[in-house]
């Protein structure tokens, strides 16, 4: 039956007829044309409305609950009267994160309802644990459920970031420049430099990446290299990429250790996508709480309260993002109306995991193309020429309970290779990692590592081993090494002790050994700073050479306001040196860190080495570049100087701006229009960034959602009124550069005394400016906010006559007293008041 809109007349009849729904008249009073449904007399007008059909709200109600205060709306139902029989035509469910959820069986029963009739009690049974009850008196439908019919409101483990907020062509260019000079002892020198550029140009979710470097700029040995030229679209959980890139930039889900150096021209496709965000901070085993009514859930561990969360009626997964990592038990306490309803113990399973996290769906990727293999050499003994080959492969990764795994199968140069990686946490203290490779030319590799936290939490231990045997085709070297190490936190045994670390590395292929032992202790920590003690020993040998032993001991003094000082001694190469180091950090300004170090031999034979060496460095953060300048004179007599600088440029249409930051290859250009050194702040996802001058560029990480809010800076005396563009919500993909152009007014609070041309005071006069008005007091004094772009005050009198005050506010900031000012155009205030002319006063 087609839906019909109620006519105005029918609506009036319906409203009149509703009066009868709340009264149970006796038979003698009932209208002869009315009928009775479920014990309620239905007037003719309302009966006609039911025959046309109407929508009523659907609420979920827990069986046994008193009243409807905890009922939740979960949708709507369309009911109609068919030949005296009330029916449900369809149910429309409305999903909400805060609402209770029904079980899948109950959901299917609801969605399958079509022209289902109500019985005489106005009820439709669905399952043994759920039924629909219609109240004609309140015109609402209740889904009455037992606890068994409730589903569980689980927290989403993944979310697509959605469409890009930037619909026009834009680009981000990151640059990294370096230059270094070596002065030799004999007076010679050499200088070299490089410039690395990474450009990402995008249109919405489509982007092209160009990555390359220039070497030896300004010298006779200039060179250039293009590392990547690739088109990419990563959207809605799938990623496609095509172009050229070197093997160092090859993206794969699984390990690919047998790929030799070279360049690949090919394509890849899969669901390993950054546009889908996986939340791995929740417990792999959901913590579930049932609430019979709205209330609180308390999580407690070892008597310590970890979290308090509020929920409505139903089964809910508790948010465990803020809980500590590990595997442990928590006590889940449900409190309703101040009373403890239930208490039970559940297990939290939160482990650090690679990739998309525990519980994420299977990830896959296929790729292939042409492979240019670079010339390869192993210690000059075994060489292979450059070669062209094909390349094809597939990668996949996933998890099973706490086990995370990844696998890759690929082929090139007529060789087939398979690789796997497994990560398995055992309890909360042990973590096992295994990585294996097997190739068709009999090459194989096995890498294993175990890390453990020993009982008591005061010590940890790790063991690594790698063994590789290469056949006659793969361009890779054999390996046979092992390492073991650990850390002992003695502070947990006695507060005056520190931390002791030891490690041993053994490379059996090259017959080299390496031992280290380090100790650190905090000697003092208080108002005046902190003092730490460092000591250690290193011993290594390489092949048949004699063992080389180095020792050091140092005191590190950290002072307030970013000051740091260290003094100590080292013994190496047969002589002992005294070392001094100092560092100063700054919160503001272009120079952020300066430091220096000085070393002098105090005993032993230095041989050809100098007895005095040292250096200095500075880290800078300027508007268009940030980096480090370093000068160092080594013991061997060489003087090394190097400068590195990096930054970013963002572009969209006619807007272009630069920054010394390199936070990502997306960003935002702020066209604030601030004059001189004016400053406001941008609050982006809770972080505060300063904005100076007319235009700023702020690089941001791609594949992210950002909430941007402009506000006054706490470090500036200026006050600004951000009229429009204060808040923005952005979704940025690689290469997306958004432009925010707020309307900003620089405000100055002006106070003074206003006079007419003859010097009389404008007492109790209403004066105006560009953004507001105020009234002077009996002495002609005023206080008002003025927009610096419109530094005028005017006063109207005698109808259309005005006088005006021109304020000099170019150097004014915050608040200013302007003293006596003259309202030009008003000869005398006394004349205005004596004539009684109508004015704004």
Curated annotation (Swiss-Prot):
Induction of the gene: Negatively regulated by H-NS. Positively regulated by IHF and EcpR.
Source organism superkingdom: Bacteria
Signal peptide feature range: 1-29
UniProt keyword terms in alphabetical order: Fimbrium biogenesis, Signal, Transport
Function according to Swiss-Prot or TrEMBL: Part of the ecpRABCDE operon, which encodes the E.coli common pilus (ECP). ECP is found in both commensal and pathogenic strains and plays a dual role in early-stage biofilm development and host cell recognition.
Protein family according to the UniProt entry: Belongs to the EcpC/MatD family.
Name this polypeptide is given: Probable outer membrane usher protein EcpC
Highest classification ranks of the organism: Bacteria, Pseudomonadati, Pseudomonadota, Gammaproteobacteria, Enterobacterales
